Amino acid sequence: VGSDQQVTVRLADGDQLTGQVVGADTNSDIAVVKIDRTGLPVAPLALDTQPEVGQTAVALGSPYGLAQTVTAGVVSATERALVGSDGVVRTAIQTDAPINPGNSGGALADLDGQVIGINDAIFSESGGNEGVG
């Protein structure tokens, strides 16, 4: 979203709404956007359980602008230490599910559809996982 305070949000049904950026973290490449629409489905958060190494992880996003893309893999690590561009060490869920530019901010979910994380980084020499077909 850069420094924009208003963004266009495209819903799964194709509707486009103007959204207000209420928070953003450039180091994680994610933002929280408020839209004025009620009755939208909400993805449940897996707050009661921690992801486990080996469990299936499903990544949702729009890599390279390909809306509503789903990829899958497994959880490879649950507390991988990463040093951000700001020098801050944070922990992350590592998965081998293909993540590419455009997946940032999308959900990482378990097979029950519960959100276990947010896609926000890729470790790659090329900058992408490619393999989108």
Indicate residue ranges for each PLM-predicted region.
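Serine-dependent protease modules
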Residues: V1-G133
